[in-house]
Amino acid sequence: MKTVIVTGSTSGIGLGIAENFAINGFNVVLNGLGDEKEIEATRARLDTMGAGEVIFHGANMLEPEEISDLVKSAEKKFGAIDILVPNAGIQHVEKIEDFPPAKWDAIIGINLSSAFHLIRAAMPGMKERKFGRVISIASAHGLVASPYKSAYVAAKHGMLGLIKTVALEGAEFGITANAICPGYVETPLVSGQIADTAKARNMSEEDVVTEVILKAQPTKQFVQVGQIAALALYLSSEQAAQITGAALPMDGGWTAQ
């Protein structure tokens, strides 16, 4: 039975990925922020979904030692870590000249450096066992830029560079590394943003979706969390053993333009 660590998995995309792995019989290590009771309820719910066991570790993604402990604790519990899904991320939108340096540091730390620390801690075990899967959740913003998102765009571009390097270093050890690059994803957070934008701009929510949120996506449809989760599961499989070092857009045609 294989074991997967998914960071930022107490809500949104990460939770959807964790659920799919749990349903398919993996041991799952959750990580993320939230109310303690709600996190435990989520863990318990996922624990009933499949044959594997689901645990939670509250490592702070800005603390390398805590990330190392996350990996060590999971290895001690399950014997091995087979799959990493670096997903944790935050966002801040501001002009470069007004962008708070502390926000820049936090976004680079959580969205990029935490993935490095996670991979660094797990890589020796993966090399020893001659198997590993690293599946980072990057973004269309790892391939293209948007104004006012300097830190996020820099971090996601950096993630693709990290993934390519991991793919090259891991190739002879049966380790693959790939990045999923979603466009706009339908999550509760985005739904709230739609409502707020509609109110602020005196627009209908439908017009906000097509003319503002999904303007960049030719399909004019949100990416679904389940679609990302399905791709992550496939990339973890033996059938995907020759897919490595890839940035895989799932963005309704955004980056094809």
Place the predicted regions along the sequence by residue.
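Conserved glycine-rich cofactor-binding loop
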Residues: 10-12
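C-terminal substrate-recognition "lid" of short-chain dehydrogenase/reductases
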Residues: 116-119, 123, 131, 219-250, ...
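Active-site helix of classical SDR
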Residues: 119, 155, 163
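Residue(s) in the substrate-gating loop at a strand-loop-helix junction
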Residues: 139
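Short, small/polar-rich loop/turn modules that mediate ligand/substrate recognition or access, typified
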Residues: 171, 176, 243-245
